[in-house]
């Protein structure tokens, strides 16, 4: 990295509800820690504040990143404001407020530049995860309060779909830069594709991932593909309900719950799978799409999920569908058509290399540099373009 990088010696504080060591952590936390590592590589001093959990100590330094863990799933927001105000996170030059539905209200306790990182808008998720009044209050904060509070802040969205959704909430496009996820280098595993049809679902087991749709699809296809199996990789608070659902549907050996796997074992599943099913209600991007693509495994996903419209190139690296019956139909057609599946497999490999983490790190670093200089940036970090485009001066 250049010796005169503006980031050298600067302090950056991330406020996030989780980290990757949290049992409920997922792709959003992986994104955060990867771009944070990129800032460390460029000479910045980075602190990540997140909720406490049993899998990690209250404070530690990992790969140059300081982690401070306090509070619970809900109290983490108040604890984050308190820690920032008291100086427990140092004297940050830039604060990155990671808004997973709720913001940390950091603008109320700091005069430093704030960058708001958003993976997706939670309009559809609030009534699913928090039915009733709690969900309505959460959506009101995300829809009304946050855009007003951060009206002068820089935003980062992980997809164009998220950028468009933020625009619907009143966030001006000239303040939203798109910094996509990357894909890790391929994890070498052997064995090749399963000799019998196999579909995989990979991710946190929570209601909005709608794993039930994949279970229903595979069971509906059993008469046509008697050897078809579904392997479900991941864990989460909805896991027991999914086990019950599969049992009630008479899934038997057709549905296998693998639980949380090591990276090597997870990629072995990707390698063996004929197809990846991604029936999520919402995805800011869909990190698993690129991971599966590295192994030549195409994805079938819902178009309405948002970020899947960019991570899946419809008809080239996978198939996008519009409803649950469409998911079942697409899986059936691809399982039966080896030539089409092979064509999509080649496309999935190509697409998985379109965005790299190194590129995402430089693009995110460019946004932080702009914040330090009082500029706003917008546009997308398209391949071959190292910084988000269209710089503009900060709004008063």
Placement of each model-derived feature along the sequence:
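Nucleotide-activated donor-binding/catalytic signature segment of Leloir-type glycosyltransferases, i.e.
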Residues: 241-261
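Conserved acidic donor-binding segment of nucleotide-sugar-dependent glycosyltransferases
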Residues: 313-325, 333-339
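Carbohydrate-associated surface elements
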Residues: 161, 182
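Short hydrophobic beta-strand element within catalytic cores of glycosyltransferases
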Residues: 298-302, 312
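Membrane-proximal helix-turn-helix segments that form the acceptor-binding/catalytic region
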Residues: 133-155
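Aromatic "clamp/platform" in nucleotide-sugar-dependent glycosyltransferases that forms part
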Residues: 281
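A short, well-ordered alpha-helix in the C-terminal region of glycosyltransferases
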Residues: 227, 340-354, 363-366
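Conserved donor-binding/catalytic core segment of Leloir-type glycosyltransferases
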Residues: 156, 187-219, 231
């Amino acid at each position: 990295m250049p010796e005169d990088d503006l980031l050298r010696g600067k302090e950056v504080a991330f406020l996030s509800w989780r980290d990757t060591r949290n049992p409920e952590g997922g792709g959003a936390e992986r994104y955060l820690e990867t771009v944070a590592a990129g800032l460390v590589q460029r000479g910045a001093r980075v602190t990540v504040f997140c909720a406490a959990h049993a899998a990690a100590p209250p404070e530690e330094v990992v790969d140059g990143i300081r982690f401070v863990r306090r509070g619970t799933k809900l109290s983490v927001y108040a604890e984050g404001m308190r820690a920032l105000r008291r100086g427990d996170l140092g004297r940050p030059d830039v604060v990155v407020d990671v808004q997973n539905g709720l913001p940390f209200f950091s603008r109320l306790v700091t005069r430093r530049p704030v960058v708001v990182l958003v993976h997706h808008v939670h309009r559809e998720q609030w009534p699913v995860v928090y039915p009733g009044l709690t969900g309505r209050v959460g959506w009101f904060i995300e829809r009304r309060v946050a855009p007003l509070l951060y009206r002068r802040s820089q935003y980062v969205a992980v997809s164009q779909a998220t950028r468009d959704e933020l625009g619907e909430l009143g966030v001006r496009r000239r303040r939203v830069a798109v910094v996509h996820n990357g894909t890790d280098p391929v994890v070498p595993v052997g064995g090749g594709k399963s000799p019998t049809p196999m579909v995989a679902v990979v991710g946190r087991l929570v209601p909005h991932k709608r794993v039930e749709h994949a279970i229903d699809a595979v069971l509906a296809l059993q008469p046509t593909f008697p050897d078809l199996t579904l392997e479900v990789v991941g864990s989460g608070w909805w896991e027991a309900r999914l086990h019950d659902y599969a049992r009630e549907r008479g899934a038997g050996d057709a549905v296998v719950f693998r639980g949380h796997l090591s990276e090597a074992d997870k990629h072995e599943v990707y390698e063996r799978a004929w197809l990846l099913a991604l029936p999520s209600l919402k995805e800011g991007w869909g990190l698993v799409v690129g991971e599966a693509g590295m192994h030549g495994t195409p994805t079938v996903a819902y178009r309405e999920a948002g970020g899947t419209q960019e991570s899946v190139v419809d008809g080239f690296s996978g198939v996008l569908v519009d409803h649950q019956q469409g998911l079942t139909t697409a899986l059936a057609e691809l399982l039966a058509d080896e030539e089409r599946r092979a064509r999509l497999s080649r496309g999935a490999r190509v697409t998985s290399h379109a965005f790299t983490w190194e590129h995402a790190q430089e693009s995110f670093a460019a946004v932080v540099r702009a914040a330090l200089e009082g500029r706003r940036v917008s546009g997308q970090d398209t391949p071959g373009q190292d910084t988000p485009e269209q710089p503009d001066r900060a709004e008063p």
